[in-house]
Structures are given as C-alpha cells and as structure tokens.
C-alpha cells in the first residue's frame, strides 16, 4: 500500500476497474428488489457547475447505499439537449446548434465520469437525437387523434423587427432583448395539451406522495388552483350596449356581490372591442394593454391602469347600472375575461377604484369593523358577516354563498362553479432547435398527423439560425410535402415543441433506451417505474414536475405504464452559495471579482471583515453570500477542484458541509478539511496494513477498554445507518465516521486482539464512506484483504451486543446540582443505584445535616437527591 494518499492515481484506477467490469450496468432481475435513483438530467451548457456536482453526488450516494443493501439499482444519465441557449450560442459563434450541443455533451460526460458516478452509461439518452424524439412525435400523433392535443389561437410576444416570437423572459421593459423593438401581442395558431382534463387527478393524487416535500405539493396545489365560486351574469340591453345579452364573470367571493360598484373586462374581451369603435383613445389604450407582457407574474406586479367605456351592465340582484371599464389587470384566459369589482374587499379593485374615483361599498363586517378607510388593510379581504346587503345581512360566508346562489338561480343569472387556475399547456415554439411537431397542413384535409411509418420528422442539423424567425419556415426542402391522406401538395408544420415535453417522459425511456418498437418497453418500464428517488432543484417544483406527472398519466392511459405517479420520493437539494466581492464601476454598475482572486481578512469568529484584490492589493466591497452564478462571478470550477484535491474530497465536502435540502456555503477551508480527513484515514490504514493483516477478532475475550472501542464502532454504524437510510442526513453520518476515527487513532495496537479490533474499525469506516468517497474506499477495501470489490460489499450491520455496556456512569445531583458520579453495573437495581449515590463521598458532604425527602432515579442517566 502506497505510503501517501494520491487521489489522482487511486481515482483513475478505481474508474478503470468499474469501466472494465461494467460495474454499473444493470438488467431486469425478477425477484430481486429494485431501486431506481434518478437525478434531473442536465442541459449541456458546456461545463458542469457546483450545483450539478452537488445534485449528482447526492443521487450517487443514495444509489450506492441502496446497492449495498442488496438491491438491483438503476442510476442512468442523459442530456436535455434542445433549447434556446444552443440557438443563442450558435448565433454568437456562427456554428450549428447541433455541433455546439454534441461537443458540450462530450466534455460534460468526461466531467461527470471524473466524479466517479455509479451510472449505467449504456442507457444514456440525448433528447435532440431522432431515436429519442421520434417517440415523442409518435405520442403526439396518438394524442392529437384522441383530441388530447388540439390547435387554437394563442397570444404571444411578437418582435416586429426580428419577425419572431419571444419568450416572456426575452422581453425586457416591453422591448425585444436582441432588436430593442417594441413588442406586440399577437394571436397565432398553436398546439395545446388538455392538461386541464387531468386537473382534478393531478391535484388529488398529490395526497399519494408522502415522500414529497410539503412545500412542493403546496406549490403544485396553488398552481392548479382549484376554487369553488360562482358564475354571475350581469345583463345588458339595447339602450346600454346596443344589443341584449349578459356579461359573465367568475368570482370566488359571491358573498360580496352586493358591494360590486363596476365591472372590468380584459383588453381582448368582445365588449372592449365594441366600446372602442369610434373611440380612438380607448382603442389606443387597448393596443397598449395588448403590447404588454403575457406573463401572469408581470401582470400581478404592474401598475393597474384602466379606461372607462360608455357601456353599462345591470347588477343581477339590485338592477343598479354599473359602468364597464377596460383594465390591464384582467386576464382574458382566466375566468371569462371579466371581473365584478368590489373595491371594499379586493386589493386590486381597491387600488383601481381609488385611482379612478370609483365608489367603494363595504358589505362584510371584518376585524377592521364596518367601514373601509383610504388605505388598504389585509383585514378588508376577510370573510365575515354581511352588512349593507339587504336580505342577506347577518349571513356568514357559507350562508351567503348558498342564499345568493339560490337568488341568482331563480333569476337564471348565475350558479356555483368549480374553476381551475391551471391553463392548457401551449407547446408550440417558433424556434428551430426543438422537436418538430409532426403535423401536415393540407388545404383539403386540414391538420393531418404524420403517419407512424413516416416518423421521425427529422430536424435538419446543419442549420445556423440568424435570430430572424424560425429557419424551418424559410426552408422549402423541410416544409414542402404531400398530404398523407389525399396526396396533394401540402405544408409541414414548422413550429417545434416546448422543450419541457422532452423532460416530461425521459425517466421512462431510461428503462428501455434502445427499444425500437415503442416509446417504452412496457415490461421494462413497469419493472423499474415509478422512480424510487428523484433529486433536483426546488425551481422545478411546478412546471417540470407537474408536466412529468401529467405525462406519466398520459402514458398510463396509453397502456405503456401501470403506475399512477412517476416519482415516489422527491429530494429538492439546496443551492450552492459563495461569497461575492465587487467594486463600483465608473458607470455606476458593479465589477464582480471571483473569490479565488480576493484575499480576505477574518475576525476572531471567522467573519469576513475585509477583502483586497490580489492583483493590486486595493480593497473590494463584500457583497455577502449568493448563489454561485456567472453574473456575480462567484463560481468555483469543479474541474479545478477535482484536479487539485480529487473527486472524493469534493464529494466528501459537498455531503458534509450541509444537509442536502439546505443551502451549502462553499468554503475553501472546508475542502481542505475534507482532504485532511481522507489523508488521516489513509495514514491509519497504511500503518495498519504495513504490519500485516491480523487474524479474526475474538469478541468473547475483549477486555473493558477494547469493549469501549468496539462500542464506538457499532454505535457509529447504527447512527449512520439511520441518518443515511431514513433521513438522507449524510452530514451527520460523516460526523459519526469522524468520531470513530478519533477513537481508532488513539486505540492501542500492542496485541493481536488490538489489531483485529482496528481491522474491524477500518472496515466499518471504509464501508460507511463507500457511497460518499467511492474511490478511496475501493482501494482501502482491497488493501484490507478483501478479494471482492467494495461496491459489492454489504452495508455494515450492527452487533447489538457490542452496544451493551457492562458498567455505566451515572451523574448524582443534590437538589438539581451536580455533586458527584457513580459507576455501576449496567444491570444494577434501583435500590443498589440509590445506595451507591447516597454513599458517594462528595455527595455525603452536601447532604450532611439535611433530611432526604425524595430520591429520583432516571435509569442509565442520573440520580437526584431532594433534601432540606
């Protein structure tokens, strides 16, 4: 065994062994417990960052631990390879997105392998390859024929200069990020998934996921947004609007109906269009609303603006005439594109009414009283007893809901209704680097799905986009085709699919990645699915995880899988954060400096109190800890860390520095500490092995000192097993290993029995570290005399007998204050313990002259003598 710990050589040798032995290739083994461990696959951006390293290390530790429990473990990896960054990089570097993507995959795959991940690389999937997306297209055609996918007009951000559609995040202050042109809202035909058909099931089956964080389930419940409310119709007539009809609104607060003082409609509402005829000012305002962002989050925070129309509607219960306003805070796609405004009890309506001097009428008695002041209070939105509401006065929310519904039904002007916030999922993207939508537009037959024998519709890979719309729409060689139904000239769809589609089913493809007769081999899929443990960032709590759940149900309904949910357990790992440093630039911005280029000064409590740039020695500002990012220049390159310290050190630091679901603060000194610890383990093992391996430990003849050492070993195994197996608390499991190391380093090695005990301790340390630091554990296991590989070794088991103490030390208190200790046989009776405590020399001094009133014995811990 080499005297020095040389991670580079040790890690290369271990990885070579795993590759040659195909150690992580798995096949279905009926009868053997399976465990499917999956970390969210990466976008091939070019280089791994520390967030990736943390994510994949957590997954790898879990996978290796489960293998040590004797399970058949699947841990695959792939690439979420379509998307906008590839198009942007292609334009910047004048290179085809395909070339850029495949080169990045090659580099990042090498990086992942250097971490020593226990991945079955034979199952690798790449979503931009036709052998992957052909099955996505196949499913699309099936769902289109069933009506689960449909086509309708949708509103998008249109850049008139670049002649292209922009994502919400590409619109900055109302202008295109590249062209700077003012963005317009446009209606274009798009394809949609009817995810709303599954809204109830997506909501209810969250209750079947006890292994998911409550926070994530709450976020999904809120996103689906099921609410029971009332559909209310406000009539209008010839005199008010020019024709008869009703304006439909949906409200979750029908109890406040008697407080409605105006109604507001979205800019796209038919009444807005009608009101704008002959009213240029209103038309200009409607156009302004239409040019704003289509993102709901932006609309929630933007300034509330509106314009009155000359139109009036009738209150359905009082007959009072209410003015119709066009308002930018009303969403056409929620409810019915119109709201009844109750300024006294809704904050948005309150703001709007105050801005435009509209009446405010309180109709609910809240904790703030019966009146509404000039400043909004949260209490105004509370449920309470109705006031100023005629025959409904005195009713609470539930009573008012029922009574007002009955009144509306009598007039045929309303009824209760369940509404969802969730909208159907629009998947059309006017981009090049995505999965082509397999539809042919025929002038005679309409929209025709591409027949299965003509799939995949292959994306040409030798294209360099120029940013001016989708190149596919300018490529007759791509879009010119014949109709599969009637044989006449037709045009292929040039939109591509939202890249969330690829990541919504990849977990199922891993079960049979080379299967060429369908999207999945149902037998293999049902063998492995659902995923036992899924690991990824909380930022995917809503969209990706909701779409993946939806797709799993679609696959179930196609007969491809039998389970209802894709992921049994979900672990959302925390961010990796690091210190930031900057100087204010001459233009008022900030120049950020990488922590590696900064020299820091700390106080006695290790808090950073000063920082200077190494190159010029001048001070820099301390920006505090933030998520590692390019924009703040506070990232640490994983490759440089692996080269300097080895993958095991990086893995150990990542697992020790913080519980996996909490933020992890990067610390160079923490990495140094992890490296020092592994060197200590190596040194102890090397010194032990160099003297020759000992014989078998004879547990029956251990002396008391040896029993203490063995107890420490097995206490650590017991605690680490609970920490890793039940709670994923890898940091506390590592702390247990460190405690054992402290004991083993001080343990005597004079006799054969001492050395046999050290052997047991080192084997336990190696096995407990094996999932976390697999390379050094691979080498140590062999050096400790084992013919098999540590990856095939079992997780250490606890010898409960080793934990039994022959003697125990009890604390003795007098009136709650520590006054002595007594050592007793573990099996001593209460009477014997009490007698020993009373007879303790030091205790006698404190009870001399006092009357003992009571003696409290807490078995195994303490004795408290109460005396006065």
Curated annotation (Swiss-Prot):
Positions annotated to bind ATP: 630
Name of the protein this chain belongs to: Leucine--tRNA ligase
InterPro entries according to UniProt: aa-tRNA-synth_I_CS (IPR001412), aa-tRNA-synth_Ia (IPR002300), Leu-tRNA-ligase (IPR002302), Leu_tRNA-synth_edit (IPR025709), M/V/L/I-tRNA-synth_anticd-bd (IPR013155), Methionyl/Leucyl_tRNA_Synth (IPR015413), Rossmann-like_a/b/a_fold (IPR014729), tRNAsynth_Ia_anticodon-bd (IPR009080)
An annotated GO BP: leucyl-tRNA aminoacylation
Motif annotated as 'KMSKS' region, chain positions: 627-631
This protein's UniProt keywords: Aminoacyl-tRNA synthetase, ATP-binding, Cytoplasm, Ligase, Nucleotide-binding, Protein biosynthesis
Enzyme Commission number(s): 6.1.1.4
SUPFAM superfamilies in the record: Anticodon-binding domain of a subclass of class I aminoacyl-tRNA synthetases (SSF47323), Nucleotidylyl transferase (SSF52374), ValRS/IleRS/LeuRS editing domain (SSF50677)
One Pfam family from the record: tRNA-synt_1_2
Compartments it resides in: Cytoplasm
Superkingdom of the organism of origin: Bacteria
Species: Pseudomonas putida (strain GB-1)
Family from the record: Belongs to the class-I aminoacyl-tRNA synthetase family.
Keyword Protein biosynthesis set for record: yes
Enzyme class, spelled out: ligase
Motif 'HIGH' region: where in chain: 42-52
A single MF term (Gene Ontology): leucine-tRNA ligase activity
Catalytic activity, reaction form: tRNA(Leu) + L-leucine + ATP = L-leucyl-tRNA(Leu) + AMP + diphosphate
GO cellular component terms attached to this protein's record: cytosol
